[in-house]
A protein has these predicted regions:
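Sec/Tat signal peptide C-region and signal peptidase I cleavage site
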Residues: 18-24
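Generic N-terminal leader/processing signal
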Residues: 1-2, 221, 264
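Bacterial N-terminal signal peptides that target proteins for export
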Residues: 1-9
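Short, charged juxtamembrane terminal tails flanking transmembrane helices
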Residues: 266-269
Length: 269
């Protein structure tokens, strides 16, 4: 596997050097500071106060885990959304205080979501623990789900959901992938990145907001409390691939072929 990966990296460098420069993807940070805070008094929205917090707040410099994904709005804080079992009267949050983001085909939203105290999946919602619904300027909505142990897990490696498969086993929960973005090794804390692929039909519209609804309840040990926390969010517009442009070496070979063909015709004539 290591040899194959190395070959892939080398091939990518070579192809990148020969191909015409590609347009860069556009990344827009979605500011979360207006929503920092806790859920029902149990979470205050500051990673430094959580287990392993002193190392978690170093994620801007020690994170990424070779994912190549950065979050410019990372600040060591998070937005906590409670589960219904925390009994604070609300378990959903709408974030829409950002300027509309014009979308291209293939646009994605990237996030850092993790659980607190674990969340038992809700069978009434296709076994999702968290539902996230995006809306656009045309009034359309697209719903996605995060499954505990599949695309979301507890931030603390303890007795809750500690696996991260990387995709949902339930396809009805949308095109979502997940990967580890940062961890502090044997200390046991981590932050995980999710990518939501927005509908291609949304190209030309703008992302205007989204709602997070924590439908999972309790935790894997029946402690009766749970929440999900977002540390950072970004919208990524995937750039269109550039038109193929012949390289100078290719043009030279083409010219040589044309000259040779002309000489052959003159000899036959």
């Amino acid at each position: 596997m290591m040899k194959r990966l190395g070959l892939g990296l080398v091939a990518g460098v070579v192809l990148g050097a020969l191909a015409a420069p590609a347009s860069a993807d556009t990344i827009t940070a979605i500011e979360l500071s207006a929503y920092y805070g806790g859920a029902n008094g149990t979470l205050n929205g500051d990673w430094s106060n959580e287990i392993g917090g002193a190392s978690i707040i170093t994620a801007p410099t020690s994170g990424n885990q070779n994912t190549g994904i950065t979050f410019t709005d990372w600040s060591g804080h998070y937005v906590a959304v409670p589960s219904a079992s925390m009994n604070d009267g609300s378990n959903a949050l709408t974030i829409d205080n950002f300027s509309p983001i014009t979308l291209t085909a293939g646009a994605t939203v990237q996030s850092l979501w993790n659980e607190f105290y674990g969340l038992i999946p809700n069978s009434a919602d296709n076994n999702a623990a968290v539902l996230i619904t995006f809306t656009n300027s045309a009034g359309d909505s697209a719903a996605y789900g995060l499954q505990s142990g599949q695309t979301i897990r507890d931030y603390n490696n303890a007795t809750f959901y500690d696996t991260l498969v990387g995709s949902n086993t339930t396809t009805a929960l949308g095109d979502v992938t997940a990967q580890n973005w940062w961890n502090n090794g044997s200390q046991g804390q981590r932050l995980d990145e999710q990518s939501f692929v927005l509908p291609s039909s949304w190209a030309g519209t703008s992302l205007t907001g989204f709602t997070i609804d924590v439908v999972g309840t309790g935790d894997g040990n029946g402690n009766g409390s749970g929440a999900a926390g977002a540390a950072a969010l970004s919208a990524v517009n995937v750039a269109d691939p550039p038109a193929s442009v012949p390289e100078p070496a290719s043009l030279t070979l083409l010219a040589a072929g044309v000259i040779g063909l002309g000489a052959a015709r003159r000899r036959r004539g």
